[in-house]
Structures are given as C-alpha cells and as structure tokens.
C-alpha cells in the first residue's frame, strides 16, 4: 500500500449546508424552507426524519467553532439559510437571522 501525504501547505477545512446543520427550524423568525415543507409532509421522508434539530448548530455554534479550532481547521465554508434571513422570500429582513451569521463570522 502506498503512503500518501498532503503537502505541508495544504489548508484543512470543513463545509456545511444550513439545513443539515443549523436546526432551529422555526426559531427567531425563520421562515419555512422547501426542505422544511417537504420533510414535514407525511410519507415523504423515511421515519418522518426532519432537519428540525439537526446538529443544533444555531444554538451550539460556539462549541462547533471550538471543535474546528481543536481539529486545526483553517477554513470553514457554510451556506446561508435564506428563510432565516428573508422569512417570506422577499421584503422584510429578519434581524435575528442576520445576527446569527454576524456572530458566526465574527
């Protein structure tokens, strides 16, 4: 078996998708996403599983960031939950949603 090594200048990081990690599906003014609607429709998802809690990153982001530091990650790419920022898809912006992403990137 060959032994491969990453170059010393390789940047280790992580990436997440909002629906799969944030949870807090209806917290702080977040609107319903397409996935929320689909997952809450009876018979659509095995066992009725949803992303309602997921990893609870919305409430545990500080712990998650600490874990990333512990792992030595130098990069983090995440997706924005647009229903958290624009609950109806247009018009009024949700200040609590913006505040979450502000805290996450601070």
Task: Indicate residue ranges for each PLM-predicted region.
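Non-catalytic accessory regions flanking glycosidase/transglycosidase catalytic cores in CAZymes
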Residues: 1-106
């Amino acid at each position: 078996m060959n032994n491969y090594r990453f170059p010393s200048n390789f940047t280790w990081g992580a990436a997440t998708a909002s629906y799969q990690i944030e949870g807090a599906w209806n917290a702080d003014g977040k609107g319903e996403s397409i996935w929320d609607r689909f997952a809450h429709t009876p018979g659509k998802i095995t066992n009725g599983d949803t992303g309602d809690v997921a990893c609870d990153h919305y409430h545990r982001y500080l712990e998650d960031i600490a874990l990333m530091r512990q792992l030595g990650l130098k990069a983090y790419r995440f997706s924005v939950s647009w229903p958290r920022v624009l609950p109806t898809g247009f018009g009024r912006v949700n200040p609590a949603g913006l505040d979450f992403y502000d805290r996450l990137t601070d």
